[in-house]
Amino acid sequence: MNKDITKEKELYFELYELYKNRLKTKHLTLEAFRFERESASQLAWAAHNIANGKWEVNGYFPFNVYHPNRVINAPFYQDRIVEQWFVEKYIQPVFKPKLHEYNMACQSGKGPFLAMDYVKAAMEEMYYMYGDQWYVFQYDIEGYFDNISHKAAKKIMKRIGKEGYAIYEKIVDSFCIRDGYAALEDPENPNGYGYPKGTLPSQWTGIILLDALNWQIQDAPG
């Protein structure tokens, strides 16, 4: 019992430290303000459930964003804290050091502006070497997050260890897209595809599953 209590306390302080740091960098929305009033009990309850293997995603609330048009399914505030803690504790230490150096998403010190700098430098080099006798290949995967295979995601995430994987399994199975092309092609497993856009676990799952393609493009440029 003392061991369980100690683990629960450690989890609480980990969540609390992350929450304090989050307040320094995030705008205080109405949802965040309401959470702050009950933050101690909310974080204690989350820590208790994680320690006992009973934590579950509380659900998502959808909203539309534009340019490009898409639906974001955001987790509730407590879940956002837990999922950020989970990503930083379990996913990033395992996968971040192995990502291709030109993978710019979800990583401190990188992002779209650094990506544009790399693209600009590459284009300048191509102009210098070949004039205008070259081309740029830009691609997008249609419906990528809506059609991510839960099975494939779980397989690669087993690398994070048993404790982290138990949490990840609950996250990935908390959401599905039944009318995506992947689910429609697999009618016996309609709940096995799709990941909510806009969550940290989904973003990291997305870049990890595609990272092999980055290396393939580098190693076989022709």
What do the PLM-derived regions correspond to, one by one?
Residues 9-25, 56-61, 88-95, 182:
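Short, compositionally biased low-complexity segments
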Residues 40, 44, 79-84, 88, ...:
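Non-catalytic, well-ordered alpha-helical scaffold segments
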Residues 46-68, 81, 167-185:
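Reverse-transcriptase-like RNA-dependent polymerase core
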Residues 68-100, 191-219:
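Conserved pre-motif C helix in the palm subdomain of viral-like polymerases
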Residues 122-222:
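Conserved polymerase palm-domain catalytic core
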Residues 21-33, 63-73, 100-102:
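Glycine-/proline-rich flexible loop or hinge segments
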Residues 2, 87-139, 143-149:
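Active-site-proximal segment of RNA-dependent polymerases
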Residues 1-49:
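Non-catalytic, polymerase-adjacent accessory regions of viral genome-replication enzymes
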